[in-house]
UniProtKB/Swiss-Prot annotation:
The lineage of its organism: Bacteria, Pseudomonadati, Pseudomonadota, Alphaproteobacteria, Hyphomicrobiales. Belongs to the UPF0102 family. This is UPF0102 protein RPE_0358. It comes from the Bacteria. InterPro entries: Restrct_endonuc-II-like, tRNA_endonuc-like_dom_sf, UPF0102_YraN-like. It holds the Pfam family UPF0102. One of its GO terms (molecular function) is nucleic acid binding. PANTHER family: UPF0102 PROTEIN YRAN. It comes from Rhodopseudomonas palustris (strain BisA53).
């Protein structure tokens, strides 16, 4: 039987970035719940991409990309057109697995997180035609 070499451990900066992302998503989810949203999914992964948070408020489902940066203004520019398309594709996959939400209004938001700042919720940050 052939031996396989274990993969090397992740670099410390990758671990730190992962933890920062998890912390930002937790802050974002708490902020959204305080604003009346119900969290339907977190870190929903598909072959097409990942959605950080899927949240519902009344007749609306929001697919929310969370961005954490040192400054809120830096976070605002962090969702690239390519990433937007991956989120739109992942949202389509989520809707296929949750058809009960397909008739609701759909929206693509961004939630920006920075240290010592309140989160900034960019409603309709981009649309599915991106």
């Amino acid at each position: 039987m052939a031996k396989t070499n274990p993969s090397p451990p992740p670099a410390p900066e990758r671990i730190a970035a992962f933890r920062t992302g998890l912390s930002a998503e937790t802050r974002a989810a708490a902020y959204l719940m305080a604003k009346g949203y119900r969290i339907l999914a977190r870190r929903f992964r598909t072959p097409y991409g990942e959605i950080d948070i899927v949240a519902k408020k009344r007749g609306l489902v929001a697919f929310i990309e969370v961005k954490a940066r040192a400054k809120l203004d830096d976070a605002a520019y962090a969702v690239t057109p390519r990433q937007q398309q991956r989120i739109v594709d992942a949202a389509s996959a989520w809707l296929m697995t949750h058809p009960e939400h397909a008739d609701l209004e759909l929206r693509f938001d961004a939630l920006l997180i920075a240290p010592r700042s309140l989160p900034r919720h960019l409603i309709a940050a981009f649309d599915a035609s991106t």
